[in-house]
Amino acid sequence: MKTKTSIFQFIVASVLTLLINDSSAATPPPPISNSSTSCNKTCGGISIPFPFGIGGKDCYLNGWYEVICNTTTSDSNTTVPLLSMINREVVNISLPDSNEPYGLVQIKGPVTSLGCSSNTSEGPQNSLPVLNVTGKGSPYFLTDENRLVAVGCGIKALMTDTESEILGCESSCEHRKSGEEVTNLICTGYRCCQARLPVGRPQAITVNIENSSGGEETCKVAFLTDKRYSPSNVTEPEQFHNNGYVVLELGWYFATSNSRFKSLLGCTNMSRKGSGFSDDNCSCEYDYFSGMSYRNCYCDYGYTGNPYLRGGCVDTDSCEGNHNCGEDAHCVNMPGPMSMCRPNPKITKPTKPPVLQGILIGLSGLVFFVGLFWLFKLIKKRRNINRSKKFFKRNGGLLLKQQLTTKDGNVEMSKIFSSKELRKATDNFSIDRVLGQGGQGTVYKGMLVDGSIVAVKRSKVVDEDKMEEFINEIVLLSQINHRNIVKLLGCCLETEVPILVYEYIPNGDLFKRLHDESDDYTMTWEVRLRIAIEIAGALTYMHSAASFPIFHRDIKTTNILLDEKYRAKVSDFGTSRSVTLDQTHLTTLVAGTFGYMDPEYFLSSQYTHKSDVYSFGVVLVELITGEKPLSRVRSEEGRGLATHFLEAMKENRVIDIIDIRIKDESKLEQVMAVAKLARKCLNRKGKNRPNMKEVSNELERIRSSPEDLDVRTENEDEEEDQPMAINNKR
């Protein structure tokens, strides 16, 4: 009897030992060289996790992640970490995790000042390059947590990048007019002001300061920062100036093309499709963010550490803290988040034969681990569902459903797509499906389950404070039904940023057809005149025929698409705004494209329907001359295409600047008539410009009655026609 008992105990112990050893047999390989003692892990009290590193080339992934530990000039015992490639002092580094699609680096940025005490010796520092993170392989970008902040009295702060995009704000210390509210919660223009970064996320930033009209000669500062200021907590400008820096935030990620990054990790989920678990206890996801594909890795549930180090994810002890094993058993830690209770050794009388006991225990262990695997899959699926619900609610999905159901009989006018449906339509947002990228987002070509071809626009960022306004714009744009306006078919709100679905336009944009010398399609004068008439008709509809007037705010040839018959389609309503029937203008932060921007709007920040007329006038000049709105030669002279054209009109030499491709075959009377109309659209004062309906009617008359046209080019209202120059040289 004792012999049988001993055999049974031996079998039980052997089976349990094999099960535990099997699950942990694959011991992680030794860490990569970043864990070497020659690589410093901290500098100046700041932790430097891999892929960042200090020391030899094996201590960091590549040059973009190299950190140099320098001693300060004031104290040789104090060290500070610097990012080598962009030469900025590091304040903090954090790794990506399952809740964030990218890592974060906080750095010290400069303060641009004007009229401060120390400026007298070195001259005013009213224009400083704040940051440049461009370059081949750069993983950095400015996050949308950053703001342009200006502090002082009578200050106008502007931010520019290499693509001449601009935003700015103005601060004053004058008392507000009666009825205007002053808030102490945010900087809205009293003592300080702030502006969000443009959705294009510029990578090379310069901050400029100017004295606004009537501004005092006092200290003024401007800077880019991820901190929030208000009139109640902002300090005096001199304190910012004397401090010499502010903190701003960079995001970073791993590009999918980084082959060295792939080879370093033991995580199995490194393909664009599929998922799984790895021997190194880490998982990686493929995703697409802000126009770039990236990998995001994290330790599996039950493990902790750095997933970017080989063997960096280590098992957490699940037996630590409370467990329910009781007095007759003890807790045994299992790999991952699990633990088991093992009975304390004692002599028991077996109720079943020893061999059968071993088989049952082995089968139980097998069922346990199979169940554990499916439990992990279920948890992951549930987490994705909860994230989709969270994004749907945050992005205004409930509000959109309410808006659609309140439209009498028009519920079908705009469809709400699921993220799964759009991932399937675009092959999981494959790079091969990209049609183009712009300031508002990336556009993919997709095919829905019914076989229809659509354009799927994945936005880069949406202001959460204006989500209700964004939803109202979706409902409004979905009601637009015009043959020369790209139709909005629906949207998806289950992702981090909303996705819009438009009808697919196959022949690209007007800019490429006009300026790409390799394009084999000939843009004759008849085609150009027809396109101008179609654009004018679409804008007339938006201004007056729609249920609510809509100002486009970004009319340019890259936003004019051409369908299979080369008919014009107005697109890109990312900056459009609707107004009530009795509104005459919108007061907004200055945003637009240089070369097309209304000078009156640039100075007053008040956008009217006549501002769209000015931009359309620039498009007319492009169609006539075949020249780009901005060129290197004219930029050096401080002139855009509009100024160049009006000078030619004034000197009666318009014929000299007509596009050589249409000069011989075009009807000169029609070209000159359109040129005269363009001059009216480019009038310096908005009130002297025609409205879009008048422009549309005039273009129709020019096409239908060429024999009745007056082709004289005498100067009329020369002083009124001359536009105010917008100097884009900083």
From Swiss-Prot:
Keywords assigned by UniProt, alphabetized: ATP-binding, Disulfide bond, Glycoprotein, Kinase, Membrane, Nucleotide-binding, Phosphoprotein, Serine/threonine-protein kinase, Signal, Transferase, Transmembrane, Transmembrane helix
Chief location category: membrane
Any GO BP: cell surface receptor signaling pathway
UniProt topology in membrane: Single-pass type I membrane protein
Modified residues (Phosphotyrosine): 502, 601
UniProt key word Transferase: yes
Active site as annotated: 554
Pfam families found in the cross-reference section: GUB_WAK_bind (PF13947), Pkinase (PF00069), WAK (PF08488)
Domain notes: The EGF-like region is specific to this family of proteins and seems to consist of the C-terminal of an EGF-like domain fused to the N-terminal of another one.
Similarity-based family: Belongs to the protein kinase superfamily. Ser/Thr protein kinase family.
Keyword Repressor: no
Cytoplasmic-side segments: 380-730
Induction: Induced by INA.
EC code(s) of this entry: 2.7.11.-
Topological region Extracellular: 26-358
Tissue specificity comment: Preferentially expressed in roots and flowers.
Parts of the chain that traverse the membrane: 359-379
Protein name per its UniProtKB record: Wall-associated receptor kinase-like 1
Composition skew (Basic and acidic residues), residue ranges: 691-714
Glycosylation sites: 34, 40, 70, 77, 92, 119, 132, 211, 233, 269, 281
Gene name of the encoded protein: WAKL1
Annotated region (Atypical EGF-like), positions in chain: 282-341
Stretches the record annotates as Disordered: 685-730
Binding site for ATP: 435-443, 457
Residue stretches making up the Protein kinase domain: 429-702
Organism, as annotated: Arabidopsis thaliana (Mouse-ear cress)
